[in-house]
């Protein structure tokens, strides 16, 4: 969903164990490899070795059509990873139950967050949302109850 250390820290180990591919929105390429931007320099720098596949919009993987909807703000490449056929969204740190992701980090932007919130409000259909932290929620619940979505 994005390139911050708490979302990519185990990638090298997972790739070594499972020989899997790693996909990331193209706008977070620098975030993945730069310890200042992915924030790992605040704890233990990651020094990522995995080769990633950059994505702009859609991929097909294991029979799933997966949309990477770029919703910048938390990072430039933050995305909803959407499994449309199953009405599931992995939201990373874009949106949480009752909140949105921080926008005060390097590579973050309040202006982009506001634009992304407007995009989220325009998504039709109800989806089950699995955020990067905290409990799951639904898109309908967030449209009704999330104060950040309702302020704009």
What is the role of each PLM region?
Residues 34-42, 67-72, 76-152:
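Metallo-beta-lactamase
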């Amino acid at each position: 969903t994005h390139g911050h250390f708490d979302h990519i820290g185990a990638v090298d180990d997972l790739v070594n164990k499972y020989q899997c591919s790693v996909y990331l929105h193209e706008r977070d390429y620098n975030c993945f490899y730069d310890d200042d931007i992915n924030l790992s320099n605040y704890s233990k720098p990651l020094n990522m070795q995995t080769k990633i596949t950059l994505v702009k919009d859609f991929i097909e993987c294991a029979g799933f059509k997966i949309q990477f909807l770029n919703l910048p703000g938390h990072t430039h490449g933050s995305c909803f990873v959407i499994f449309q056929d199953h009405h599931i969204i992995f939201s990373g740190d874009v949106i949480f139950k009752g909140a949105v992701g921080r926008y005060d980090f390097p590579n973050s932007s309040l202006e982009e967050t506001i634009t992304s919130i407007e995009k989220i409000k325009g998504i039709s259909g109800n989806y089950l949302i699995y955020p990067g932290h905290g409990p799951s929620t639904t898109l309908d619940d967030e449209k009704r109850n999330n104060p950040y979505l309702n302020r704009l």
